[in-house]
Amino acid sequence: ELFPKLEERKFQGAYSLSGGEQQMLVIGRALMTNPKLLILDEATEGLSPTIRLEIWKVIEVLKNKKISILIIDKSLKQLQILADKFYILEKGRTVWKGFPNELTTNTAQKHLGV
């Protein structure tokens, strides 16, 4: 339902899937247990733009279903669209927290180098 592309290939082994399709499979497996919290660490790293967008759309659907999602990612623009709250960590410590609209260019440059 969330990943129609995988539905077409449901009888194939996971080894035959592309990297992006394998990532979708991993997320789908994690969702089978109806988690209260989903942790995604660089879930779209190294994936094609098409697959990356598909995964971000699924994250938006999950967010609307009230599933808490902790996303660790470098895609600042996409995170600003999806996130309810931001935490910036350096060496294991929170150096900034707030809402996406509060994240200024200066803060991003200082802590994220962007």
Report each predicted region and the residues it spans:
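Catalytic Walker B motif of ABC-type/P-loop ATPase nucleotide-binding domains
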Residues: 38-41
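Conserved catalytic motifs of ABC-family nucleotide-binding domains
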Residues: 34
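A short, surface-exposed alpha-helical micro-motif characterized by mixed small hydrophobic
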Residues: 79-81
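ABC ATPase C-loop
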Residues: 30-31
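H-loop/switch region of ABC-family ATPase nucleotide-binding domains
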Residues: 73-74
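Helical segment within the ABC ATPase nucleotide-binding domain
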Residues: 53-65
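Conserved ABC nucleotide-binding domain
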Residues: 2-15
